[in-house]
Amino acid sequence: MVNNMTDLTAQDAVLPVWQTRDHLDDPVIGELRNRFGPDAFTVQATRTGVPVVWVKREQLLEVGEFLRKLPKPYVMLYDLHGMDERLRTHRNGLPAADFSVFYHLLSIDRNRDIMLKVALSENDLNVPTFTRLFPNANWYERETWEMFGITFTGHPNLRRIMMPPTWEGHPLRKDYPARATEFDPFTLTKQKEELEMEALTFKPEEWGMKRGNDTEDFMFLNLGPNHPSAHGAFRIILQLDGEEIVDCVPDIGYHHRGAEKMGERQSWHSYIPYTDRVEYLGGCVNEMPYVLAVEKLAGIQVPERVEVIRVMLSELFRINSHLLYISTFIQDVGAMTPVFFAFTDRQKIYDLVEAITGFRMHPAWFRIGGVAHDLPRGWDRLLKEFLEWMPKRLDSYVKAALKNTILKGRSQGVAAYDAKEALAWGTTGAGLRATGIDFDVRKARPYSGYQNFEFEVPVGGGISDCYTRVMLKVEEVRQSLRILEQCLKNMPEGPFKADHPLTTPPPKERTLQHIETLITHFLQVSWGPVMPANESFQMIEATKGINSYYLTSDGSTMSYRTRVRTPSFPHLQQIPSVIRGSLVSDLIVYLGSIDFVMSDVDR
């Protein structure tokens, strides 16, 4: 029975239409009804801005295949994960479920998404694997099985991915402890140490690999988890025939901190500092999707000044991250000097960020409904000095290193893939745009007032190789400088917080005049604001690709479920598909061109 839920709260009245109900009338809903019948689905009303459709488990693959072959198809599996529904109280009109799995599909041609959900009983946690339709479902299904115990039948290798192989239990279940103090004290006996070492020993047969061919044995090489070219605690096992990579297995999880589980134990406000540490180079960029998603739940419209301030800080951190990426890529190819120059330039950005926010790498400065405080005196002078400094420095990187024939020879045509492969593996950011697909969320789905800025989206010519990816990042720095110039010239006047009951913390000045305001301030700071029961979603163009938060509120001071989708996770999953048949030296250049940090992968 089609059930368009109508129990959204009264606060929907203050939300823009695109944030509330228009997704219920998305054309894809009609296409699905025409194909599968009017009674096949439950359509859920949310504040995600995305059609959310509950499908029967038996129809999942058929529906996915239908969406993949529409005239304007849903060509990317953007995200896939699960939820423990057992303690959720606000489920009016939803199918009965102990657990659920969601599939977030994206259409470039439509510039629209759809989310499919499957309800599961605790006694039958089985669902067919989506890898038959999208290869990047592999890692997502492994993580979902690991975190919830949901089995994906037909999966090629359903095993742990974030946790050690010997780990017991499923951490994102509601009955699983969230704090270390809830566990017994950890002791490492000699026997346990030997067991852990044995579990980490790579066995080719477990991954469908052969130890040799008819004439010779293959060599298996551990690259990482402490190799400098691995860019973090990242291990990749290489199957080698001489210098040629026959196959490889990326091994992640060494940096896993349980960021999504933490979201269930922190208030909506106190979780903001954790967002900075998911991708520790992005700073305020990481805070943007989270606070926007919470503001959708709350029904908050922030002042224009807040939007521009947020854009300004985000673009400063984008440049900061790109400079590190460009310089370390050059270093990976063999040139040492540029990385030291880049740290000089990045120091200027940190000085500016510190002057505005009080912190450097992890400001935790965005707030629900605004920012922590207004811009300080002299911010415009510091920004102007940086804008005068940076363009010439960027030109020097291009002239001295990126036009070097040796660097070009090492990177042009290396680790190349086309648009079809990029979409199949969930690639976003510069890696996707290098294939010729013009998709930047700041342009395609503007947020925080990006529609009011003039800037271009650098796009490649059809094939994404190492050199194209790094040169696009250079051009993105130039466009970020353009945006910053507009912030400098056109910073609006006005408040730095929204006048809304759920703005957190609320304006403190009023606490001196009204006891009710003082009580509200105390409760919101100590316990946190209570968000209406609903779901919200926000994606942004982060430094390394598309980053998003999918939040579920059950009418509490804390999130019921916090899903963090990061770009680096699918980018590393793509490595074997791209690098097979290449040399080890090509892999080093490829890793340098991806632009990832392991905290972004492992969360």
Swiss-Prot record:
Subcellular location: Cell inner membrane
Entry keyword set: Cell inner membrane, Cell membrane, Membrane, Multifunctional enzyme, NAD, Quinone, Translocase, Transport, Ubiquinone
Annotated segments matching region NADH dehydrogenase I subunit C: 1-193
EC assignment: 7.1.1.-
InterPro entries with a match to the protein in the record: NADH_DH_suC, NADH_DH_suCD, NADH_Q_OxRdtase_suD, NADH_quin_OxRdtase_su_C/D-like, NADH_UbQ_OxRdtase_30kDa_su, NADH_UbQ_OxRdtase_49kDa_CS, NADH_UbQ_OxRdtase_CS, NDH1_su_D/H
Reaction(s) catalysed (UniProt annotation): a quinone + NADH + 5 H(+)(in) = a quinol + NAD(+) + 4 H(+)(out)
Region described as NADH dehydrogenase I subunit D: 217-603
Bilayer disposition of the protein: Peripheral membrane protein
Gene3D superfamilies according to UniProt: Cytochrome-c3 Hydrogenase, chain B, NADH:ubiquinone oxidoreductase, 30kDa subunit
GO molecular function ontology, one term from the record: NADH dehydrogenase (ubiquinone) activity
Cross-referenced SUPFAM superfamilies: HydB/Nqo4-like, Nqo5-like
Oligomeric and partner information: NDH-1 is composed of 13 different subunits. Subunits NuoB, CD, E, F, and G constitute the peripheral sector of the complex.
Family, similarity comment: In the N-terminal section; belongs to the complex I 30 kDa subunit family. In the C-terminal section; belongs to the complex I 49 kDa subunit family.
Free-text function comment from the UniProt entry: NDH-1 shuttles electrons from NADH, via FMN and iron-sulfur (Fe-S) centers, to quinones in the respiratory chain. The immediate electron acceptor for the enzyme in this species is believed to be ubiquinone. Couples the redox reaction to proton translocation (for every two electrons transferred, four hydrogen ions are translocated across the cytoplasmic membrane), and thus conserves the redox energy in a proton gradient.
PANTHER family documented for this protein: NADH-QUINONE OXIDOREDUCTASE SUBUNIT C_D, NADH-UBIQUINONE OXIDOREDUCTASE 49 KDA SUBUNIT
Identification of the protein by name: NADH-quinone oxidoreductase subunit C/D
Species the sequence originates in: Cronobacter sakazakii (strain ATCC BAA-894)
Gene name tied to this protein: nuoC
